[in-house]
Amino acid sequence: FAQKKQPENTPSPIDTGEILRAVVGIETTVPANTRTARALGTERNGNGIIIDNEGLVLTIGYVILEADSVNIVKPDGKKIPAKIVGYDHNTGFGLVRAIKPLNLKPIRMGKSADLFAGKRVLIVSHEGELPVMAAQVVSRRPFAGYWEYLLDSAIYTIPPFPKYGGAALIGVGGRLLGVGSLVVSD
């Protein structure tokens, strides 16, 4: 039988199961005497996104900042110890690496430069009643996180997402385009 060729610019179908498995939980413990413990707490939870086959996980930095213990929570609930690889003060991103194999496929990377106001996206978290939510980019503008970083072109989306810390911002074709940080009122 004949098949019609799909145009080059048509996005590939999204495998939501694959995306959901690439978004994991991050649990950290921070000593009470650290600079950030009072404001951010000593037990922090967030999301992380598997970005390579060696257990490298991208998250938002405040989840891991000053942590002395890090666990990655897999989709099946199993906790895998991890080590902090780095924290980028320019972007506010953090990286951790699993000590044991995760045996999970990494997410495909996209280009956040392709996002502009009006674009539809998905926000994906590790947990919650609704781990996936449709959203829309409302603007790209500067963001000053006085405690951490300054972004020239932060991505602002609506509606607000309850499990935002380290959540994956997914674009057309199922590619990672951003990492959730916080909810702002404007």
Q: Where do the protein language model's features map onto the residues?
A:
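N-terminal activation segment of mature serine protease catalytic domains
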Residues: 2-49, 53-62, 69, 116-121
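Conserved active-site neighborhood of the chymotrypsin/trypsin-like protease fold
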Residues: 31-33, 52-132, 154, 159, ...
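C-terminal cap/linker of serine protease catalytic domains
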Residues: 3-16, 104, 123, 129-133, ...
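Short secondary-structure boundary/capping segments
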Residues: 15-16, 85-86, 147
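Active-site region of chymotrypsin-like
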Residues: 22, 26-37, 41, 99-106, ...
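Conserved hydrophobic positions within beta-strands
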Residues: 48-50, 82-84, 137-139, 169
